[in-house]
């Protein structure tokens, strides 16, 4: 947990990693992000700009299914890479869209003042392996906390982000 600007072990301190995983699954499932706040500092377990923080009774993550069909979210833990440490997996099941095959969430730095920096996040939609559109999702602001120049590099196209985004060809969202 981040307490008064410092990392501190606490009960519930890892709950934001679960919220971040659910948030990214929601982005990939094309859910409307109703409420989401970033951390004070960028998280180390997800690209800058793609985190979500929660604090019971104060800060929440809220997403909305705007499709015409029900969605089902399954969460589970398993040792995906054999290192003995389980990872949180989130799968969202729903009706298969026809307009796109995959959504890849991205984020990039848009402003760096030295003490704070801001990012944009977006969904990149793919159909048959080709990018068909981008949709800006959120602007996040973080306190600088030792991030590298690479993490905070500002792309040539500040409004639309990096150009070299590729589909993952993975199925984080299940249809049927």
Language-model segment annotations:
Residues 1-176:
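Well-ordered beta-sheet/strand-loop patches within structured domains
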């Amino acid at each position: 947990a981040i307490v008064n600007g410092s990392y501190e072990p606490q009960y519930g301190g890892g709950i934001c990693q679960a919220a971040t995983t659910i948030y990214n699954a929601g982005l990939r499932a094309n859910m409307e992000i109703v409420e989401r706040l970033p951390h004070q500092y960028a998280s180390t377990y997800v690209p800058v700009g793609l985190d979500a923080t929660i604090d019971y009774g104060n800060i929440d993550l809220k997403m909305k299914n705007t499709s015409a069909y029900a969605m089902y979210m399954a969460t589970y833990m398993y040792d995906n890479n054999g290192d003995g440490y389980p990872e949180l997996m989130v799968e969202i099941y729903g009706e298969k869209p026809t307009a796109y095959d995959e959504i890849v969430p991205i984020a990039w730095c848009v402003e760096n003042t030295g003490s704070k920096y801001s990012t944009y996040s977006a969904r990149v939609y793919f159909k048959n392996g080709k990018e068909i559109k981008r949709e800006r999702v959120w602007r996040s602001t973080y306190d600088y906390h030792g991030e590298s120049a690479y993490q905070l590099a500002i792309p040539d196209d500040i409004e639309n982000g990096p150009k070299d985004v590729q589909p993952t060809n993975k199925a984080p969202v299940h249809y049927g």
